[in-house]
Amino acid sequence: YEMKYRLVCSEMCIRDRPTRLVHGDFSLTNVIVNPKTNKISSILDWELSTLGDPIADFCYHCLQYFINPILGDINQCKELNIPNLESYRDMYMENSEFEISESEWNTYMGFSMFKLAAIAQGITGRVRDGTAAGKDADKFFEQTVSLADLGWLFVQK
């Protein structure tokens, strides 16, 4: 997987995008929603924030559409006003200064899957060492290879 990861990283140099402040772990689990307005009132968990590529940050955020068991089938969440992935991506591109081709999108999504696989592998190491904090941390071992495989499928599209 290391060689595949290196290939994905080299492909991400497709465009020289401007650097922006990126969250690093933006997801629905890291926001507080105002129950009266249904709008995000706070964004939490900024310890991974840095200056970086906003498209990479957005694509990592979009992994929720593929791997978030809490939300179930997020593409079926119209009643919650959650758009499907294609609509969400289009809205982001329309409201940002960035454009991304389908090929670039797949490369960025593959990179995001590899990133999450690396995080899962790190958690697996903490389970092995007895330093894992989460009660379900031992389940990450099973997901590491699957995430890397899914990342590679994206890159090959």
Regions flagged by a language model, labelled:
Residues Y1-C9, C13-I14:
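Single conserved hydrophobic/aromatic residue that forms the stacking wall/gate
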